[in-house]
Amino acid sequence: MKKILLLIISVFLIVGCSSQPQENKKVSFHQYLRQIFVEDMENDYLTMHSSLIHPEKYDIEVKKISFGNIDDKNINYKKRLKTLESYKDSLSGSDKTYYKILHRTYEDQVKMDDDKYEYMDNICDPNNSFTENMATSLLEFRFDNENDIKNYIKLIESGIDYCKQAVAYLKKQSEEGYFMSSRVSSEYLQSLNKLMTSSWLVSSFNKRTFSFSLSDEKKEKYGEDVKKAYEKSLYPGFKLVKEAVLKYKNTSKNASGLSELKNGKSYFEARVQSILGVDDSLSQMKEKAIALAKQSSDYIQSHLNAELYYKITASNSTGLRTYRSVIQDLLQRYQEDFEKLDHINYEISAMDQSNASSSTLAYYVNPTLDGKETNIIRVNENSTQSKDSLDAYSTLAHESIPGHMYQFNYARMLKRPEILYTVSYLGYAEGYATYVQDYAYKYAPHIDSDVKDILLAEQHLQYALVILSMIGIHNDSYSKTDVKRLWSDYQMNLSFTEVSSLYNQMLDSPFMMCPYYLGYMYIKDIQKNMKSKLGDKYTNKAFNKALVANGNVPIALLESTVIDSMEK
């Protein structure tokens, strides 16, 4: 399924050239890369708009204002691979790296476009549904001038066409036996119902402030137009989707994980591999998770005693009682282990509560690549996490410094060919941001180091057990009893209620934690290998610089790019 708006990392960049790749006339490698970037931007209005303030400067023509295509099959990746391969023998240096990254990216796309996997993606996943993505795209839409308001209204008006595509997809999904379970359908409908009123959209627009001149009368008129567009298009579209889900909700054959479906095991493995950008089998991934589980469990068992347990259960406050003070603290400390970036302008703003989950503390909104606007961290004032907690500190490290905000700003200064900024391996992006949370545990003030070490080991153990449970459910047909036994084997005794909640979450969203926890494990393995390879010459700062030195890359290539960077 197409991700309408990537809020996490690296889907953006700038370019100029002609609007279609000139396949019949051989151009230079860099010209070709610029051409396919333009093609991608012209085929994806939302990515183009969120990436560029002035697309016209790069000869990018807006073809259609819309949410795109549900199946995201408007690009011939096999043709791209063939054209890319025609340049292979002439490349050297950095161009070889660029070639490898793009070649792997398009190979993974071709693999997932296999007809046998068609209609297996759950576009109504309660944790990442297409309707929630539509809402997020509208709530985060950027207004640089009055024409953007007009385009915003056109985008809303296009919503019904996108929803009709979704309805056709759901119908076919039901016919193929891949429709979500009735329980997941009910969860999805709860979130959809929240969007079936214009208030969230209209109130969000009315709260906007604009950097350009707009009279109160005009803003009020545009607010009325937004409401009319919602009532004319978006609401009827959502209604069609709701009717389709109600119609097909009892046709599901997916009550016990993907392993029970035709091609389910193959799809699960292929999808995990494509999220990470690796060729490793699920068995090899399980080995990584088992190793981390054993290491973490052994540490906990050998270090936890009554005195330390008491300290852990006591109040563990960082003393930082605002989100701003947390980020300021991180900005002062991260330079111990990460290369300093020039001053990063950022602002903290509240999430729109119409689209916020109480379990979500914060997220990072990527700025454009041809502008100098402020980085934005959205925070949830109604989060269940206390602002002065270690969890809040590590989450903000994940989203800001030295996590996604650092990632994005470092990548932007690399000046690579533009198309490389459309590469988005979540296994790398989220694996890196999860990896830097280890440093957050190190940096967090006012909490004893032995407490932080135990709590971090518990986090690592949970990473491993979640991955083992995920693979167990969707590849090995684990029951709830199997999952409970797995956790008990590592002295994590969950109640049946806790097991049911965990099991259902992984059943509903098979890939949700994969990029975070498996990505983390791969990065830690690369770090271990580099420590062994370099010995006394190894430093965390050099390794962390090497991790971001090539931007977003498939993990299969990450170790070689890290080696190249650290051995220069």
Region annotations inferred by a language model:
Residues Q20-K568:
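N-terminal maturation segment of proteins
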Residues M1-I4:
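Positively charged n-region of N-terminal signal peptides that target proteins for export
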Residues V15-G16:
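C-terminal motif of bacterial Sec signal peptides marking the signal peptidase cleavage site
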Residues V11-F12:
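Repetitive helical segments and hydrophobic/amphipathic motifs
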